[in-house]
Amino acid sequence: IRYAQKNMDVVHAVNFQPVSLTGRMGKGEREKYRITVPDCIQRIEEQTNGEVTVDDWFPVPSCMPLTNVIEAFSSKPKYELSIHFACGAGTYIFEDAETKKFVPLTKFCDIQGMLELFEDKAEEIRSGKNKYFTMLEVVRKLKGFVDTKKQPAGLDLAKMFGNILMKRSFESIGSWHVKGLFLGMMHFQDKYNEDLERLQRCDIHYLTPDLRIVPFCAFNVIPEWYRDRIQKKYSITVEEWEQREGVKLEDGLYRGLMRRGAG
């Protein structure tokens, strides 16, 4: 995180993956090596000297009210991060220009109140209220959730959120993202902690050639049922692929490297 702080002109996110334990391990070994999302969050608080606390984090599905109000306003289905609450967490932090200390989003913005507003207004639009007047009301109220005295210099959070809500574009999201540093983590499961409720709410899937949708933590955690069996059934050699497609694999690789600016 400190490395990212020193390079925030090019680094805008740090994502942690608490280790998944594989192979034969006794209970003592598992307890020794096991680290969970709450463990990581606690250690981040300790290692940032309390600049980023455990209270600054939100489970991933907390962003659903924002998705809901944008979906209601646009009348188009949107991608939903509606995964199980235990799958991951995230927060946004900014840097104080004078002290160089981190200022988490929660320190100057009432996120809980803002999310409640989004959910309430999404329901109003769905129930038939004029969506344009409703969204104007949302944008008008955004400033009330931001403590401008604590807000980092050069940041206008209410304006950026308003742009995201009204423009709903990658550019509007990008202008927000480059101003801060996203911290996130997602704990992929293993055979010692596989949770069926988490699998049922998975947001990262594999689509197999036989048109099955398999949750990530089932596909990779139980490979003898899914990954290995599927790959064995459908994999082909490079030579077979080249003959079928009528191209050389190395030619495609070369073109890909050229597009990325390689020599």
Please state what every model-predicted region is:
Residues 75-263:
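Radical SAM enzyme core and accessory elements
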Residues 67-74:
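Extended, Lys/Arg-enriched charged tracts that mediate electrostatic binding to polyanionic substrates
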